[in-house]
Amino acid sequence: MQGITELLPISSTAHMRIVPALLGWQDPGSAFSAAMQLAALAAVISYFWGDVRDLLFGSLDALTRRDFSDRHFRLASWIVLATIPIVIAGVALSGVLNACNSPLRSLTVIGWSCIAMAILLALAEIFARHKRTIAEASLADALLVGVAQIGALIPGVSRSGSTLTAALGLGFKRAEAARFSFLLGLPAIALAGLKELWELHKVHLDAHGWSVLATGLVVASISAFFAIWGLMRVLERFSAWPFVIYRGLLGVVLLLGLAMGWLA
């Protein structure tokens, strides 16, 4: 479930709250969270390996040549700069976001967040020009999408949902918007994974625990890879409307479940 929903613009948090609530599952803990973040990172790097490779080696080559106008070096630099807003916001709000009794973690907030993002994504889909490519991106574009990542700190928004919406709003083609979103999100996903890995030092896993963690990482990586593949196919051939509809319905189901007592 987490592997599939982590990288889709449909909020993995909403799914990982509603399914355990319905089935009575317990919180899987930091080991599970670390595995999911690392799985997401592995999936994005493997799917967009051509872009990642070009950015890495192109930037290194540009540095040796001192060619700071090189397109690979510029994009890599912008990706780093675009990560700063969510790092600052994450550190500043960590006390509120990580508190067990934080109102932001309630199913009510998650439900309304799903609906709000469905509306914003719908507006982006309706009014966007869908003409630009990553080759036409600017520093301002990268920073705006980077700022949009802050929305991911609110449960129910989803990082891919907020950044895809921002990129579409800036006029990028649908598939290019998703590609831009994932590449810009690599440092944020990596930092989140490192944070969860740091939490693992508090967990004393035995051999069985590590084997379960490794299995979960592999399965989640594969499912996340195919989730990206599916997202790109939908955006290339159709539009973002399937995700708009799904998000909206998910938010309504969450709020109805709370009102009627299915969820708590």
UniProtKB/Swiss-Prot annotation:
Bilayer topology: Multi-pass membrane protein
Gene Ontology CC terms, in alphabetical order: plasma membrane
Subcellular location: Cell inner membrane
Reactions that this protein is recorded to catalyse: di-trans,octa-cis-undecaprenyl diphosphate + H2O = di-trans,octa-cis-undecaprenyl phosphate + phosphate + H(+)
EC number of the protein: 3.6.1.27
Classification via HAMAP family: Undec_diphosphatase
Family: Belongs to the UppP family.
Name this polypeptide is given: Undecaprenyl-diphosphatase 2
Source species of the chain: Mesorhizobium japonicum (strain LMG 29417 / CECT 9101 / MAFF 303099)
